[in-house]
Amino acid sequence: MGIAHTEWESVIGLEVHVELNTASKLFSPARNHFGDEPNTNISPVCTGMPGALPVLNKDAVRKAVLFGCAVEGDVALFSRFDRKSYFYPDSPRNFQITQYEHPIVRGGCVRAIVEGEEKTFELAQTHLEDDAGMLKHFGDFAGVDYNRAGVPLIEIVSKPCMFSAEDAVAYANALVSILSYIGISDCNMEEGSVRFDVNISVRPKGSKELRNKVEIKNMNSFTFMAQALEAEKHRQIEEYLSHPNEDPKKVVPAATYRWDPEKKKTVLMRLKERAEDYMYFVEPDLPVLQITESYIDEVRQTLPELPHSKYMRYITDFDLAEDLAMILVSDRHTAHFFETATMSCKNYRALSNWITVEFAGRCKATGKTLPFTGILPEWVAQLVNFIDRGVITGKIAKEIADKMVSSFGESPEDILRRHPSLLPMTDDHALRAIVKEVVAQNAASVEDYKNGKAKALGFLVGQIMKRTEGKAPPKRVNELLLAAMRDA
């Protein structure tokens, strides 16, 4: 990256499509379920049959209102649906029912931690709309699956308030956490339950100008999102630097791109349509949506504790490291697992480390996260308590953790009962002999410690633990070692 590139900044906004986990579709009684046989979850409404009239799903409305409350948005007492007209094979009606001028939620914000700094990202609006079907290609022909047609969506539109790929990914992560906590979507990005359209433009640093934006469609991976934003940022900067005297609007026209993960580049799909190209007009078959203040308050009362407030509580009440607190709260199941474990163990920092680092790493190979392995929170608490009480060493604890993950059905106590060889060394006479031997064989390190070099103590402890295969109680090792060095 040349020096000139550092004199530019990105301006980024996200449009996020979230499939709501209602039992039926937004405007019809057809089943809303992913993975069924093609064209089995359909109705005359979602296939655009003449005379079929839409009926609004009240559960979808409730979920949209709940989201509005979660992000502290202004839930509209009156909102309206519009037709967005376009022709494409996966849209049998040749229009989408959306909310163009009067969305159900305006404003709101999402708080996220970006590289240790708390940032607040503002939302423009959130609106209800129905999804399109899905084209499936088979060699020289294509089929259309209308199971997804009519699935309820909320589209969450942020303001252009992000200025780096790191900002965008942090915002997206925080948003998905909120959606998961309030339970309005399964948030399965691989199945398309959450899809990100990323808008990016660039400008010289210090400028307030908003240049033409490029939209990168259907990102379903945070890694790809970061890569795409970086690649598109540098592509646009290069275009402007290569054409310094031309009209910026012509240098980088408004367009839609896609991300090619193999070539690591954005690929042009089409130039941007204008709003008038969609011929928006009021949906004639649906009345104005009216919501009362009392209904909004009733929905607001059902909000759980949200990720950001939980994150702040973990730092203050449990004295957790910020990075581990963030990992814990990013998934509501993991957060619940941790809080259940704290009922049996008060070493909160050790608990957070075992859950987010030790067990998370071991569970990765199973394809499951810790809360879904069958390992109970009480067992992890028991493991930490055993270490703290000197029942086992840290090394033995890791061996027990390996067995807990491989068996999924045994507590540390069960494992120690079946594998007594894992119990720590209890022969104090034998341990004294090992300590005496290590001190005698490492006279230089003993002298270093006596001269104030604290690292020498760690080296000597390491030698003792090595000879005892990690089974010597660390506290007893320190006691015997310090006594032996005083006598040396």
Curated annotation (Swiss-Prot):
One of its GO terms (molecular function) is ATP binding. It comes from the Bacteria. SMART domains: GatB_Yqey (SM00845). Keywords: ATP-binding, Ligase, Nucleotide-binding, Protein biosynthesis. Its EC number is 6.3.5.-. InterPro entries: Asn/Gln-tRNA_amidoTrfase_suB/E (IPR017959), Asn/Gln-tRNA_Trfase_suB/E_cat (IPR006075), Asn/Gln_amidotransferase (IPR018027), Asn/Gln_tRNA_amidoTrase-B-like (IPR003789), GatB (IPR004413), GatB_C_1 (IPR042114), GatB_Yqey_C_2 (IPR023168), Gln-tRNA_amidoTrfase_suB_CS (IPR017958). Transmembrane segments: none annotated. One of its GO terms (biological process) is glutaminyl-tRNAGln biosynthesis via transamidation. It catalyses: L-glutamyl-tRNA(Gln) + L-glutamine + ATP + H2O = L-glutaminyl-tRNA(Gln) + L-glutamate + ADP + phosphate + H(+); L-aspartyl-tRNA(Asn) + L-glutamine + ATP + H2O = L-asparaginyl-tRNA(Asn) + L-glutamate + ADP + phosphate + 2 H(+). Pfam families: GatB_N, GatB_Yqey. Heterotrimer of A, B and C subunits. Belongs to the GatB/GatE family. GatB subfamily. Allows the formation of correctly charged Asn-tRNA(Asn) or Gln-tRNA(Gln) through the transamidation of misacylated Asp-tRNA(Asn) or Glu-tRNA(Gln) in organisms which lack either or both of asparaginyl-tRNA or glutaminyl-tRNA synthetases. The reaction takes place in the presence of glutamine and ATP through an activated phospho-Asp-tRNA(Asn) or phospho-Glu-tRNA(Gln). This is Aspartyl/glutamyl-tRNA(Asn/Gln) amidotransferase subunit B. It comes from Chlamydia muridarum (strain MoPn / Nigg). The lineage of its organism: Bacteria, Pseudomonadati, Chlamydiota, Chlamydiia, Chlamydiales.
